Amino acid sequence: MAKLQITLTRSVIGRPETQRKTVEALGLKKTNSSVVVEDNPAIRGQINKVSHLVTVEEK
């Protein structure tokens, strides 16, 4: 399966709790931190919820 590199580009300060939890569930902690995860429907759904806060690249 393909891998995705997700980078937190905007801060979660002032965002709703659900968006903060989603960012945390993706494994992102600080602004500009990145994680590489497997591409699957669950991860894609999480990315869609916080798409305005993250950037995604295919690896």
From Swiss-Prot:
ATP-binding in keyword set: no
Keyword Ribonucleoprotein: yes
GO MF annotation: an example: structural constituent of ribosome
GO cellular component, one term: cytosolic large ribosomal subunit
GO biological process: translation
InterPro entries: Ribo_uL30_ferredoxin-like_sf (IPR036919), Ribosomal_uL30_bac-type (IPR005996), Ribosomal_uL30_ferredoxin-like (IPR016082)
Entry keywords, A to Z: Ribonucleoprotein, Ribosomal protein
CDD domains reported for this sequence: Ribosomal_L30
Organism superkingdom: Bacteria
Assembly information from the UniProt record: Part of the 50S ribosomal subunit.
Family: Belongs to the universal ribosomal protein uL30 family.
This protein's name: Large ribosomal subunit protein uL30
The species this protein was found in: Staphylococcus saprophyticus subsp. saprophyticus (strain ATCC 15305 / DSM 20229 / NCIMB 8711 / NCTC 7292 / S-41)
